[in-house]
Curated annotation (Swiss-Prot):
KW Translocase (keyword) present: no
Name used for this protein in its record: Nucleoprotein
Residue segments, region Disordered: 1-22
Motif Unconventional nuclear localization signal, residue numbers: 1-18
Predominant subcellular localization, coarse grouping: virion
Similarity remark: Belongs to the influenza viruses nucleoprotein family.
Location(s), subcellular: Virion; Host nucleus
Highest taxon listed in the record's lineage: Viruses
GO biological process, one term: symbiont entry into host cell
Molecular functions (GO terms): RNA binding; structural molecule activity
InterPro entries the record matches: Flu_NP
Transmembrane helix is among the record's keywords: no
One GO CC annotation: helical viral capsid
Length: 498
C-alpha cells in the first residue's frame, strides 16, 4: 500500500511500541512471547501439572482464558456491581484435565484473579503486558475462525452467509486494541458498525449526551479503521460518507453492506499473524530458549520453527479423526481459516480438506461431555515450507470458487490467482444505485467488473524451505486451479455461540 510509510508494523501495534527498527521490534515481540511462556510454566507449577498435562491444548486454553478474565476490567467491574448467584466476581477458573490411572479426568479449578494477575505480572517483569494479553485473544479468535461458522451473525446484520471470508476476528473483544483491529476482516468491522447504527435507530438517546459523544467518537474511529482497510479511492470515499453522516441510519447500513460485498472482489487489507497456544511458548522457554535475546516475529519463519519441534497433545472424542483435529489447530495457529486451501495444503505439505469434510468438532470440551471416554493424541503442527504472512488482500482478480464461500482472504504472501465467483458476487449488485453514494457505487461496480482472472496476486512471491531462514530462494508453487479452494464449502460446522 502506498501509505505504508505512515503505518506502524503490526509488531509495533502488538507491543504498543513507537517506531522501532527491525531488531528492536523482534526483541520486543520476543519479550512479549517470553512473558507468556514464563507465565504458563508458573501456572503449570501452581496447578501441579505433569509435563504431559502441560502440553495438553485444552489445559493451555483454560489457563489462557483465566488470565484474560483476570484482566478484563470492565467485566470484573460489572460482576462486582451486579452480583449473580453462585458466581464469585473475584475468582476465575475452568476445567483442567489430568491423567489419573490411565484415564483422563476433569477437575474444575477456581483461582483468585488477584493471584493470577500477580503471576502474570511477575512473568512480565512486573508490567501489565497488555500486548501479551491481546496476543492470546488473537490466538483464541483465530481458533474460533477456523472452528465455527458465523452464518447467524451475518444474517442478523443483513449480510450474506457466503461472505464468511470477510469475518476474520469476529469474536475478538472490542478491548483488543490496535493489534486486534488490524486482524479484523472488513465484514467484522462492518458488522460492528451496523450493530451500532441499529442501536441508534432503536434508542433515541444512543447518540445523545455525554455517553452519546463517546459513542460517536467510537463510531468515527471504527469508520476510519474500516476505511484504512480499503485499497481503492471509491471505497474510501464511501467510508467518509458513512463516517460524516449526521444521523446514521438505514442508508448507512445499506452502504456498509454494499462495501462489505465489494470487498469480496476488491479485497481489503487484513493483517495475519501466527499466534500459538501459550503451552508452545512455555515449552520453548522451559527448554532454555531466550525469546528476547533471539528476537521473534509473528509473520516470518519463527512460528513455523517453533511448531516444528513442539509436541502438543489434544483430547480426542471417540469418533473424531486426530489428523483432522491437527488440521484445525494448524489453520488456527497460522490464522489461515479464510486462505485458499491449495495454498495452505502446499505449505503444510499435507492435503487440507474443507470444513464440511472434517471429522472433528472444536478443541474445547463442554462440561457435560464424558472425558473418561476420551483419548489424547499428538497434534501434527509441522509444515513442509514456510511463507510470509500478508497484511494486504492481494490485488484482485477472479476465478472459479465454490458455492458456499465465494471468496478468500489470503494469509500467506504467495503468488496465485485469488478465486471468487464473479457471477455470484455481481448478482448482489443489481439495481440499488441511487442516493448520495451513487457515483462511488458505479465506480466500485465498474472496478469489480473489470477485475481480470489472469492477474496474479503477490507476483513472484513464494514459499520457502524451512532451512531458508532469510527467505532468499522463493519457490513459486503452481496450483491445480480446478480443485476446490474454499474451506467453508459445503459447510456443516457448528455455529459460534458466545
Amino acid at each position: 500500500m502506498a501509505s505504508q510509510g505512515t503505518k506502524r508494523s503490526y509488531e509495533q501495534m502488538e507491543t504498543g511500541g513507537e517506531r522501532q527498527d527491525a531488531t528492536e521490534i523482534r526483541a520486543s515481540v520476543g519479550r512479549m512471547i517470553g512473558g507468556i511462556g514464563r507465565f504458563y510454566i508458573q501456572m503449570c507449577t501452581e496447578l501441579k501439572l505433569s509435563d504431559y498435562e502441560g502440553r495438553l491444548i485444552q489445559n493451555s486454553i483454560t489457563i489462557e482464558r483465566m488470565v484474560l478474565s483476570a484482566f478484563d476490567e470492565r467485566r470484573n467491574k460489572y460482576l462486582e456491581e451486579h452480583p449473580s448467584a453462585g458466581k464469585d466476581p473475584k475468582k476465575t477458573g475452568g476445567p483442567i484435565y489430568k491423567r489419573i490411572d490411565g484415564k483422563w479426568m476433569r477437575e474444575l479449578i477456581l483461582y483468585d484473579k488477584e493471584e493470577i494477575r500477580r503471576v502474570w505480572r511477575q512473568a512480565n517483569n512486573g508490567e501489565d503486558a497488555t500486548a501479551g494479553l491481546t496476543h492470546i485473544m488473537i490466538w483464541h479468535s483465530n481458533l474460533n475462525d477456523a472452528t465455527y461458522q458465523r452464518t447467524r451473525a451475518l444474517v442478523r446484520t443483513g449480510m450474506d452467509p457466503r461472505m464468511c471470508s470477510l469475518m476474520q476476528g469476529s469474536t475478538l473483544p472490542r478491548r483488543s486494541g490496535a493489534a486486534g483491529a488490524a486482524v479484523k476482516g472488513v465484514g467484522t468491522i462492518a458488522m460492528e458498525l451496523i450493530g451500532m447504527i441499529k442501536r441508534g435507530i432503536n434508542d433515541r438517546n444512543f447518540w445523545r449526551g455525554e455517553n452519546g459523544r463517546r459513542t460517536r467518537i467510537a463510531y468515527e474511529r471504527m469508520c476510519n479503521i474500516l476505511k484504512g482497510k480499503f485499497q481503492t479511492a471509491a471505497q474510501r470515499a464511501m467510508m467518509d460518507q458513512v463516517r460524516e453522516s449526521r444521523n446514521p441510519g438505514n442508508a448507512e447500513i445499506e452502504d456498509l453492506i454494499f462495501l462489505a460485498r465489494s470487498a469480496l472482489i476488491l479485497r481489503g487489507s487484513v493483517a495475519h499473524k501466527s499466534c500459538l497456544p501459550a503451552c508452545v511458548y512455555g515449552l520453548a522457554v522451559a527448554s532454555g530458549h531466550d525469546f528476547e535475546r533471539e528476537g521473534y516475529s509473528l509473520v516470518g519463519i519463527d512460528p513455523f520453527k517453533l511448531l516444528q519441534n513442539s509436541q502438543v497433545f489434544s483430547l480426542i472424542r471417540p469418533n473424531e479423526n486426530p489428523a483432522h483435529k491437527s488440521q484445525l489447530v494448524w489453520m488456527a495457529c497460522h490464522s489461515a481459516a479464510f486462505e485458499d486451501l491449495r495454498v495452505s495444503g502446499f505449505i503444510r505439505g499435507k492435503k487440507v480438506v474443507p470444513r464440511g469434510r472434517l471429522s472433528t468438532r472444536g478443541v474445547q470440551i463442554a462440561s457435560n461431555e464424558n472425558v473418561e471416554a476420551m483419548d489424547s493424541s499428538t497434534l501434527e503442527l509441522r509444515s513442509r515450507y514456510w511463507a510470509i504472512r500478508t497484511r494486504s488482500g492481494g490485488n484482485t482478480n477472479q476465478q472459479k470458487a465454490s458455492a458456499d464461500q465465494i471468496s478468500v482472504q489470503p494469509t500467506f504472501s504467495v503468488q496465485r490467482n485469488l478465486p471468487f465467483e464473479r457471477a455470484t458476487v455481481m448478482a448482489a449488485f443489481i439495481g440499488d444505485n441511487e442516493g448520495r453514494t451513487s457515483d462511488m457505487r458505479t465506480e466500485i461496480i465498474r472496478m469489480m467488473e473489470s477485475a481480470k482472472p489472469e492477474d496474479l496476486s503477490f507476483q513472484g512471491r513464494g514459499v520457502f524451505e524451512l532451512s531458508d531462514e532469510k527467505a532468499t530462494n522463493p519457490i513459486v508453487p503452481s496450483f491445480d486451479m480446478n480443485n476446490e479452494g474454499s474451506y467453508f464449502f459445503g459447510d456443516n460446522a457448528e455455529e459460534y455461540d458466545n
